[in-house]
């Protein structure tokens, strides 16, 4: 049986909030089977829980938030959510003593290290996957995203940025997903932004944690970070990282082929909601026999050692 995963032990890290610029303590806790992914704000009394749920997602200019029925929110969840998807973590409590998850270096890599450090524990309950049965597509102007049936998890993402720093040949990225491929090829890709946007936001008391330490920063001509890019195509790889996190907001790894053109958080979420709303387009599946599991979701070699 393919089993649900959680952490072996509690781990903690500190970082800076992208919005406030203040120190945030992040605590990742193991959780029992069928808990799902729960984000928790401990700065509120009593603490407020935000279960990962496609319908709770709000996309803002700076980040993805989860918002509850009382309009309380937790921000900047997308990169940690991508790390959870990458390692196939089904059950976890994510605690922060702030309104947001720390931005760390703007990628998912620090969260991957934290999860690997905690260790992955298998629970004696079958892991549920969402399997795509029919093609579902959403559009917004010339942007679109779609899922098709496929026995695995493949991603094909194209961006269209007319910018001297982004070579035309580096605007498409395709990948057959696996935990190892995610860690090596996607997790280190950082978020990016324009210097002028960051300066404007900071002049209004926003994005106070934004810096060269947590993003690729560009002006109209070039990348301003002294160390340059981690990959030639880091921009499109980061958009794929975002998509992996966005699509895991249903709390389950998805079996299907994802293709997107110029998509972002809002359209990725619209696709996920469109799939879930169409009952005949998907089904929950479990695997009694590991041999039947799509290669994409085999346990990562270094994690379950």
From Swiss-Prot:
Enzyme superclass (EC): hydrolase
EC number: 3.5.1.108
Binding site for Zn(2+): 79, 238, 242
Pathway the protein acts in: Glycolipid biosynthesis; lipid IV(A) biosynthesis; lipid IV(A) from (3R)-3-hydroxytetradecanoyl-[acyl-carrier-protein] and UDP-N-acetyl-alpha-D-glucosamine: step 2/6
A biological-process GO annotation: lipid A biosynthetic process
Cofactor: Zn(2+)
Lineage top rank: taxon: Bacteria
Catalytic reaction annotation: a UDP-3-O-[(3R)-3-hydroxyacyl]-N-acetyl-alpha-D-glucosamine + H2O = a UDP-3-O-[(3R)-3-hydroxyacyl]-alpha-D-glucosamine + acetate
Family in the record: Belongs to the LpxC family.
Function: Catalyzes the hydrolysis of UDP-3-O-myristoyl-N-acetylglucosamine to form UDP-3-O-myristoylglucosamine and acetate, the committed step in lipid A biosynthesis.
HAMAP family for the chain: LpxC
Protein name per the record: UDP-3-O-acyl-N-acetylglucosamine deacetylase
Organism of origin: Cronobacter sakazakii (strain ATCC BAA-894) (Enterobacter sakazakii)
Gene name of the record: lpxC
């Amino acid at each position: 049986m393919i089993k649900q995963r959680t952490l072996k032990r509690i781990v903690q890290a500190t970082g800076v909030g992208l919005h406030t610029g203040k120190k945030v303590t992040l605590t990742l806790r193991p959780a029992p089977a069928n808990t799902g992914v729960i984000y928790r704000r401990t700065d509120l009394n009593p603490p407020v829980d935000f279960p990962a749920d496609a319908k709770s997602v709000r996309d803002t200019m700076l980040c993805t938030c989860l918002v509850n029925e009382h309009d309380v929110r937790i921000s900047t969840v997308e990169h940690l959510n991508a790390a959870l998807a990458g390692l196939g973590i089904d059950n976890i409590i994510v605690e922060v003593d702030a309104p947001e998850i720390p931005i760390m270096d703007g990628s998912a890599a620090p969260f991957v290290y934290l999860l690997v450090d905690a260790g992955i524990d298998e629970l004696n309950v079958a892991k549920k996957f969402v399997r795509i049965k029919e093609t579902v597509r959403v559009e917004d102007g010339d942007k679109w995203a779609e899922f098709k049936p496929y026995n695995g998890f493949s991603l094909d993402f194209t961006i269209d940025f007319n910018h001297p720093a982004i070579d035309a040949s580096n605007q498409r990225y395709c990948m057959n997903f696996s935990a190892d491929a995610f860690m090596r090829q996607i997790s280190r890709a950082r978020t990016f932004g324009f210097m002028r946007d960051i300066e404007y936001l900071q002049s209004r008391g926003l994005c106070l944690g934004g810096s060269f330490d947590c993003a690729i920063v560009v002006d109209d001509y070039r990348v301003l970070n002294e160390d340059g890019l981690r990959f030639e195509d880091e921009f499109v790889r980061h958009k794929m990282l975002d998509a992996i996190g966005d699509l895991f907001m249903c709390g389950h790894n998805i079996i299907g082929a994802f293709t997107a053109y110029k998509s972002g958080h809002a359209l990725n979420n619209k696709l996920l909601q469109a799939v879930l709303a169409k009952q005949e387009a998907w089904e929950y599946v479990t695997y009694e026999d590991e041999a039947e599991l799509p290669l994409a979701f085999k346990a990562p070699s270094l994690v379950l050692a």
